[in-house]
């Protein structure tokens, strides 16, 4: 059984820094994060879709500026190749599909059997970002949750205009213990 992990909130106790790991109605394992941000949905949308920003935190190289239904190719990053010895597919066969794109409120895509959904809604103070990753492998929940939490830290720093002075992959390794 997966434990729900909560920590001190970001805005008025409503925003947990930790993701929650849960079982979906169809029995799959998923991770959910919620962030309350001081920025309008349009700025948050740019932070999760702009290739220049994605390269600082997203675990693959991908062009999301495509029509809904398009096949996507998620390439291994240079850092993953260097650090983990991961190899990119030389044939660059599609390994995903864009399922929904409704700027600036919903982005959903399939990647290697997983569904990733980004929902952005306006709030009086800015935006609520809800990210859900439905996993293909339940054993990947802990490292995936740590990785997404580290990535969201970079997104928030980018939105704040703050320099990212840490290594997101090393940060994910630090956070992994919080999901055990």
Range-by-range predicted roles:
Residues 99-100, 105-157:
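Beta-strand/loop substructures that line and gate deep hydrophobic ligand-binding cavities in soluble
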Residues 32, 51-91, 167-174:
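Short beta-edge strand/loop motif at the mouth of beta-sheet-based domains
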Residues 27, 88-92, 110-112, 123:
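A generic structural micro-feature
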Residues 21-22, 64, 98, 118-120:
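A structural signal for short hydrophobic beta-strand segments in well-ordered beta-sheet cores
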Residues 2-64:
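Hydrophobic ligand-binding cavity/cleft-lining segments
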Residues 2-16, 135-180:
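A conserved amphipathic terminal alpha-helix motif
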Residues 28-34, 71, 93, 106, ...:
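Intrinsic-disorder/low-complexity, polar/charged segments enriched in Ser/Thr/Lys/Arg/Asp/Glu/Gln
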């Amino acid at each position: 059984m997966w434990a729900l992990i909560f920590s001190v909130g970001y805005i008025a106790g409503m925003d947990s820094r930790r993701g929650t790991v849960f079982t979906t109605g169809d029995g799959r394992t998923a991770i959910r994060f919620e962030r309350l941000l001081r920025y309008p949905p349009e700025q948050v949308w740019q932070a999760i879709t702009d290739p220049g920003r994605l390269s600082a935190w997203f675990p693959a190289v991908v062009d999301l500026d495509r029509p809904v239904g398009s096949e996507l190719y998620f390439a291994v990053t240079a850092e993953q190749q260097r650090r983990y010895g991961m190899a990119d597919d030389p044939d660059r066969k599609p390994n995903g599909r864009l399922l929904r794109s409704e700027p600036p409120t919903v982005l959903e895509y399939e990647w290697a059997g997983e569904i990733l959904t980004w929902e952005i809604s306006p709030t009086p103070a800015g935006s609520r970002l809800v990210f859900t990753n439905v996993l293909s492998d339940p054993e990947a929940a802990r490292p995936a949750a740590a990785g997404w939490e580290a990535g969201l830290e970079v997104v928030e720093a980018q939105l704040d205009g703050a320099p990212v002075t840490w290594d997101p992959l090393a940060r994910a390794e630090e956070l992994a213990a919080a999901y055990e």
